[in-house]
Amino acid sequence: MRIQALSLFLVFCLCGVQAQVKTSQIPTWVTPTEYSQSPAIDKNELSQGTLQLLRDNQTHLVKETVYIRQVTQVIDNAAIQEAGTINVDYDPTFQELVFHEINILRNSSSIDKLQPNNFQLLRREANAENYLYDGSMTAMVNLSDVRPGDIIDYSYSIKGFNPIHKGLFSNSYTFDGYSPVGKINVRLLSNKPLKYKGFNGLEKPFLNKINGLNEYTWTSTDVTPLTYEEYDPAWNINYKLLLVSAYDSWASVVNWAVNVYQENQPLSDDLSSHIEQIASATEDEGERIQKVLDFVQEDIRYLGLEEGIGGYQPFSPNQVYEQRFGDCKDKSLLMASMLKQLDIEAYPMLVNTTLKQSILDFLPSPIFFDHCVVKVIDNSGKVYYYDPTISSQGGSYAKTHFPDYRYGLVIKRGVREFDQISSRSENKVEVKDEYRLDSIGKGAILKVKSVYHDAKADQMRQYFKSQSLNAINKEYEKYYANYFYNIKSIEHPQLTDDVLANRLQVIEKYKIDSIWQPMEDKKNLIEVQFVPNSIDGLLFIPNVEHRKNPVSLDYPSHHIHDITVHLPAAWDIQSEIESVEHDSFDYQYRATYIPFVNQLKLHFEIKSKKDHITVEKFSDYSRKVNDLSNKLGYVIYTTSDGSSLTEFETGNGTLKIVGLIAVAALIIMILVVRSNQSARNDAYRRRGGFY
């Protein structure tokens, strides 16, 4: 996992304070894996005070059992707290946990620490704050007398595969990470041939026959850590990854999903009545689509019960309608069922919210999806996509924002390939700052009008619904305090929401006590800086010339920031204009002075054209960025006593006007709101399922 999100844990102890776990000898089918206590790795790369000597994963597909062994050395005292606690998660609805060994190796001796009565069984809902409950259990044991230099060696088996897959096995394994590992071993035993695929130089397995079974073994030793780079796209598979799957095609995954999403009962009277009310109240097909979408998004609250097959199989539309909650697959099936009852073609569709185009390189399997949405085809044949888990969306049915998931697999018999999805949204943000400056050296009044479109409007609408006006006002004040000293809000932000057009406007008003600041290294000079902060917050300058990974861009994205300054006196300002066109973005800058009203107008605009910069294009892009970095802002300056500028002499002659400054660096960076999706992705990676 490239990003580990910090989660709040709701912990419920079951069966009292202590509970006995099952124990047994190591299964006879497991092959002992040797490892070195002194691997050839750079110990300066270690983090958190531990060295993982062995990561061993062996799976017997016929017995539906996974054997895990972890061997970790404690390097210093700081690691004892974490290394001395063993946690193993499993799903009790279809899995059984059995521990085999827990040993501490110290000075050539082995200390047996497997005491079944010392275990605690906990129910830890790691994603409860995001309304996801997977029912998993955690067996936890705290080891006594752990010391620096100890090697902790433990192993266990988890018996049972999720029955939803009906014996079709698939999984993924990583062979590196952000800390070095002495040895990584993956071994699979199967009575049928397996499809496998490795990424980034992962070698082919060692193949063997053992007791009539196909044996596949992958081993990596002295594993060096990955190099972390900021803004590496989530879809970029830059690590050694192994995929294994028994599914022979994406069509077979579709057939699996059709059976899992099959509606085995007619719609209930209550649900049918609700659909009939929608039909009676509307005549237009688009209105009906909109009504159903609004109902599923706003009236069916998001909550997922993911135990066992619940991670993949939706509840029936009748149950979801009655209980008024569901996760992504529940909401999607309900929405599709309601639309079909209205004679509108609709299907649930599986997506991966982060893999995007990389999903095309994966082996077919349902475990590589983490989300479910809806595809709708109107009577004219036009296609629309909707995410029923998003709330507070604006826009008509034809212009509802759909995230850039890129590819989706429609759950419809006969489908053999992905739908390619192009976002219709521009996600424009328009900000207009108006400064009215008092006399020179004094304060100013700042009025800000921000207009949000598409996904940006959806996000702001949800933000205003989830926060009090007082809290928002304080947060806005705190934000502008980064730019101006002693700034106070004059009134609460004023919200105007055109839901149908999905256009949300916010007006703010502030008083700045002292907007002028002394210029650095310039005696008797004061200045005012004007920064397009809506763009400034998006951007940063590359600090390296070359990269190993692509750079994520905020896409689709269009930001316009206009600044109007009412000056307290005449200024000698020259108009300027500049534009930059790049294959990944367009940039426009314009400065205009209107002398008869002493008004300065600044225009900054940037529009992304791609969602990333390739490694090959990075150097060229970096040069463009550095050329622009001195133009993202404007400063005016004068003497501290307000004397005539035309009479003030500098070393370079008469000081007359303002200058462009390097207020911030420039590059478009990704700012995707995950709301709850990050947590959903973490849950998916941990155990599988659609959220």
Specify the residue positions occupied by each region the protein language model found:
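Intrinsically disordered, low-complexity segments enriched in small/polar residues
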Residues: 14-15, 47, 686-687
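Bacterial N-terminal signal peptides that target proteins for export
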Residues: 1-6
